[in-house]
Amino acid sequence: MNNLLAVIELLKQNQVVAYPTESVFGLGCNPNNEEAIRQLLQLKNRPIEKGLILVAPTKELLLPYIDESQLTEKHWQRFDTITEQAVTWIMPVHKNVSHYLTGKFNTIAVRLCRVPAVVKLCESLGFALTSTSANFTGLPPCRTALEVKQQFGDHFPVLEAETGNRMNPSEIRDIFTQHIFRQG
């Protein structure tokens, strides 16, 4: 990760970057900056209504976005359980979270991601990252830094590191019902 410090600086400056997740590269930015989120949505041509996933290596970095009052110990155990398949959980959203993150929903999508690159980024920054697959509409998600450069251009900031080598994107589940919205 020879460009880790440069990518961290860009994220501090509210820029959009690409970074490796469990299976593909994601596009991410500071979830606390609406202008950065708008840039990400525009770059990807993603409708605001869809919302975004937040990833972090620890629950503590995701707590500012979650309405904890609706969750029991059972829900937190479910959330904390490490499985072979990466799981994005649909959870109750804290009232102060921007609609740029939630889209048309009154929930927030969050995932514990322990890929080394995500751990290093989030620990250095002190916040979670937005995550949506690094690809343009109609093209497959990028699985390598080279593929990101091919789709987004040589000058697009990408953290040159390995994904978690999972084949499928994360499964998306409801924390209360465990209903699967997207199979992983």
Swiss-Prot record:
Compartments where found: Cytoplasm
Keywords from the UniProt entry: ATP-binding, Cytoplasm, Nucleotide-binding, Nucleotidyltransferase, Transferase, tRNA processing
UniProt GO cellular component terms: cytoplasm
Example GO molecular function: tRNA binding
SUPFAM superfamilies: YrdC/RibB
Highest taxon listed in the record's lineage: Bacteria
Keyword presence, Transport: no
InterPro entries per UniProt: DHBP_synth_RibB-like_a/b_dom (IPR017945), Sua5-like_dom (IPR006070), TC-AMP_synthase (IPR023535), TC-AMP_synthase_SUA5 (IPR050156)
EC number(s) recorded for this UniProt protein: 2.7.7.87
Tagged with keyword Cell inner membrane: no
Main localization of the protein described in the UniProt heading: cytoplasm
Catalytic reaction equation(s): L-threonine + hydrogencarbonate + ATP = L-threonylcarbamoyladenylate + diphosphate + H2O
Primary enzyme class: transferase
Domain YrdC-like, chain residue ranges per copy: 1-184
Swiss-Prot/TrEMBL GO biological process terms: regulation of translational fidelity; tRNA threonylcarbamoyladenosine modification
Its job: Required for the formation of a threonylcarbamoyl group on adenosine at position 37 (t(6)A37) in tRNAs that read codons beginning with adenine. Catalyzes the conversion of L-threonine, HCO(3)(-)/CO(2) and ATP to give threonylcarbamoyl-AMP (TC-AMP) as the acyladenylate intermediate, with the release of diphosphate.
Family: Belongs to the SUA5 family. TsaC subfamily.
Protein name, UniProt field: Threonylcarbamoyl-AMP synthase
Organism annotation: Haemophilus ducreyi (strain 35000HP / ATCC 700724)
